[in-house]
Amino acid sequence: MKPILPDYNSAGVLIIGDVMLDRYWYGPTGRISPEAPVPVVKVENNEERPGGAANVAMNIASLGGHAHIVGLTGEDEPAKVLTETLSALNVKCDFVALPDYPTITKLRVMSRGQQLIRLDFEDKFENTDATPVLSRMDAALPNVKAVIMSDYAKGSLEHVQAYIQKARAANIPVFIDPKGADFERYRGATLLTPNMKEFEDVVGKVKSDQELVEKALALVKEFDFEALLVTRSEHGMTLIRRGQEPFHLPTQAKEVYDVTGAGDTVISVLAASVAAGKSFEEACALANAAAGVVVGKLGTSTLSEIELAEAVHGSQDTDFGVISEKALIEAVKKARARGEKVVMTNGCFDILHAGHVSYLNHAAELGDRLIVAVNTDESVKRLKGPGRPVNPTDRRMAVLAGLGAVDWVVPFSEDTPQRLISEVLPSMLVKGGDYKPEEIAGGKEVIAAGGEVRVLNFEDGCSTSEIINAIKGGKG
């Protein structure tokens, strides 16, 4: 069966926690200072990246999800840099600025791929008022499907219990990247993602997988969690849930250059995947694949939806089902570079029947890759009228993505896919029915780009409307 990535565009996630700015200074070093026995670095360039909870938000945005971040900052230049950088990535920033504190900033001096020193600019947030964060949560919770709390023990989650209770009262799952040995403060959270060291700091040394599972289950019961996901470095990760068998995943990392931010990526992909409708097991598999990618990058890193898809299915296998428009365009570019012919079609596909399957099989035979663009629910309602669609967008796309003939499934919200087709520009555009090529939405653009437009016949005797009427009439 062909695995399916979720539609991350449907994932709204609220992130609360320790936001920070990671700064990097890069340069060569070839001598020792005459002033002290330390290397001299000639700084040639620099870089600034959101870190901590801000890196979590950036990861979700990079996947195509909707990230809303709340955290404590100072009233200073690093706070402005964070806001500008994240806003440019479509992250909604809702920071609480405290004039008596600096924004947490970490400066790393790098040379020849190695970190020589890290300078931290910070004061722990203490005795802060929870009200500003709680009021921001009230505004955000109706628009999200998951909450992440990213704890680096810098004080932004001083009132974490109040935040957990508010989210859980709204029936929103809470995912926490913990810090320290006091798991009592996280009581009632949905899922924690401790690494092996953090886990052993709480339960003591673990000598076997069975002991890990037993101790994890004890924590789940003691602190009223739903699950623990223990990340285990070269041993992969293990999901432990109440009443479920443990779920072990081996590591997917090929090379490890830098683990900075890997935990951020794990919890980002995990929560975004659950918010997009995936089970815990499916979400963990995606998070494990994501971790294998980011540890192969230098510095605090994110990954795109296309990188995640390639990590899950192999760099040469792009048969990954449901995909965002942005990731689709990137995937099509790679397919063209491999000399593959890309075919595209579109439709509502409300109740998939034999006629649809026959049509899609025929379309797939015309090239190497088949894209199916699917009208969203709002688009179908405008085109088909009341009572349609019968099946919502995510279910229609999931069924299509499960067909062997289909490579990519992408939603569009307009009445026609003309704009989407003009962005993708497939080698061939296919449409079923009694059309002239020049009448097909997007056909002119495809032809102008050197592509081809084909009209295929539908199989007689197959109609979604007839199926609906038969069901209403109690037939069949």
Curated annotation (Swiss-Prot):
Instruction: Give the pathway annotation.
Output: Nucleotide-sugar biosynthesis; ADP-L-glycero-beta-D-manno-heptose biosynthesis; ADP-L-glycero-beta-D-manno-heptose from D-glycero-beta-D-manno-heptose 7-phosphate: step 1/4; Nucleotide-sugar biosynthesis; ADP-L-glycero-beta-D-manno-heptose biosynthesis; ADP-L-glycero-beta-D-manno-heptose from D-glycero-beta-D-manno-heptose 7-phosphate: step 3/4; Bacterial outer membrane biogenesis; LPS core biosynthesis
Give a Pfam family name.
CTP_transf_like
Q: Which intervals of the chain are annotated as region Cytidylyltransferase?
A: 344-476
Q: Which residues cross the membrane?
A: none
Some GO term, biological process aspect, for this entry: which one? Answer: lipopolysaccharide core region biosynthetic process
Q: Where is this region: Ribokinase?
A: 1-318
Family matches, as Gene3D superfamilies: 3.40.1190.20, HUPs
Top-level taxon of origin = Bacteria
Q: Please give the InterPro entries that the UniProt record associates with this protein.
A: Bifunc_HldE, Carboh/pur_kinase_PfkB_CS, Cyt_trans-like, PfkB_dom, RfaE_dom_I, RfaE_dom_II, Ribokinase-like, Rossmann-like_a/b/a_fold
Active site at 264
Q: Which GO MF terms are attached to this record?
A: ATP binding; heptose 7-phosphate kinase activity; heptose-1-phosphate adenylyltransferase activity; phosphotransferase activity, alcohol group as acceptor
The EC class name is: transferase
Residues annotated to bind ATP: 195-198
Q: Give the protein's function.
A: Catalyzes the ADP transfer from ATP to D-glycero-beta-D-manno-heptose 1-phosphate, yielding ADP-D-glycero-beta-D-manno-heptose.
Q: Which family does it belong to?
A: In the N-terminal section; belongs to the carbohydrate kinase PfkB family. In the C-terminal section; belongs to the cytidylyltransferase family.
Q: Could you identify this protein by its name?
A: Bifunctional protein HldE
Annotated source species: Vibrio parahaemolyticus serotype O3:K6 (strain RIMD 2210633)
Give the lineage. Answer: Bacteria, Pseudomonadati, Pseudomonadota, Gammaproteobacteria, Vibrionales
Protein's gene: hldE
